[in-house]
Regions:
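A structural "domain/chain start" motif
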Residues: 1-87, 174-175
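Short, solvent-exposed, polar/charged sequence segments at loop or secondary-structure edges
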Residues: 71, 75-76, 85, 90-140
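Glycine-rich loops and low-complexity Gly/Arg-rich segments
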Residues: 79-83, 114-118, 153-158, 173-176
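Alpha-helix boundary/capping detector
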Residues: 64, 82, 108, 145-146
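Amphipathic beta-strand/beta-sheet edge segments enriched in Tyr/Trp
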Residues: 3-4, 126-174
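Short, flexible active-site-adjacent loop segments at beta-strand->alpha-helix junctions, enriched
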Residues: 60, 94, 158
């Protein structure tokens, strides 16, 4: 019959890729790369004094892969890092905010600038983190490769300017 193992008993369980989807190692790589670039950015080093409020909106899945759950985990990870970093007050991406976004969205899979600005003012948010992930998929007789490109950016609510953006590349392959 099947055998079961805990990752706490065998940490190597998380090392191997099991699919072409995004796993914990991919999300940690993305979070670490984004956070390092974000914290080293001119945007963060030149923040004005006073209250700085940020909220993580959404990361749009523009791939053919079923990675919605992984992207929601990444959103929560970004929120956690921002909360623990102490530079910003974080407005949680909870069901109320999601509902407002879905109700006011006027086009596409991303939140348009007018909606983002209105939500920011309504919620007292200075900056929004949001993004999208796309992919390029190739297949041969015995292999399938997915190259993900994740774009995460920070938009200033009052000006609608993108004040920070980072690209993170992740490649997964299955053979056999």
């Amino acid at each position: 019959g099947p055998s079961y193992q805990r990752g706490t008993d065998d940490p190597s369980l998380d090392e191997a890729a099991m699919s072409t989807g995004l796993d914990r190692a991919d999300l940690e790589h993305a979070m670490d790369k984004w956070l390092a670039a974000f914290n080293a950015s001119g945007f963060v080093s030149h923040l004005p004094s006073g209250p700085r409020t940020i909220s993580v909106l959404e990361i749009s899945n523009e791939t053919s892969e079923h990675i919605g759950s992984a992207l929601r985990t990444l959103i929560t990870s970004v929120e956690t890092k921002l909360v623990n970093g102490g530079t910003f007050d974080v407005v949680a991406n909870d069901d109320v905010v999601k509902s407002a976004i879905l109700t006011e969205r006027t086009r596409g899979d991303m939140v348009d600038p007018e909606t983002m600005s209105a939500l920011g003012k309504e919620l007292g948010v200075n900056y929004f983190v949001h993004g999208r992930v796309g992919d390029t998929t190739e297949k041969t007789k015995d292999a399938r490769r997915v190259q993900y490109t994740l774009f995460l950016k920070v938009t200033e609510v009052s000006t609608r300017r993108t004040v920070f953006q980072e690209q993170i590349d992740i490649t997964k392959q299955i053979t056999g």
